[in-house]
Amino acid sequence: MKFSYLYLTLLIIWVEPLKANVDINEIIDNMYYEIVNTKKKYLSIKSNLRSPYINNYSLYTNYLDSLRLLAGNLEIKRQKLFLSIIDIDLSDEDIYFINELNNNSILLFNIINSFGRIYDTYLINMISSEYSLEQYSLDMESLLRLEKKYSLFKL
């Protein structure tokens, strides 16, 4: 009888950490794929916005709204990541991966918002000459440097 209790106790000790690892791995994988999918959607919107075939103002505003939604959804997913790991015992490796995911998520969020701000400013000032082509070029150059500097698009 004592052997059964000992066996049961050991089984619980060994099974619980495995259960936690499966949950944390699933959480990490979900956030990773969320970042990758958001990056793909961002690149798609970016290429469509820069297309010479778009000449309708309403299409531009639709794309800008899509960028806002994309950034908002990414921020919500990032917050859910931290809410979901509150009660999980994390290893050093898990903490490292979560930190990397958090950094990439924040970086992608900032890049999406920067790109949206550039095009929003461009659209608002398209009729007037307050936002020059030179300023637009400088803004886009700094955005591209930000994308390359952090190697975000090697995910």
Annotate each language-model stretch with its function.
Residues 23-33, 61-68, 98:
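Short, charge/polar-rich alpha-helical segments
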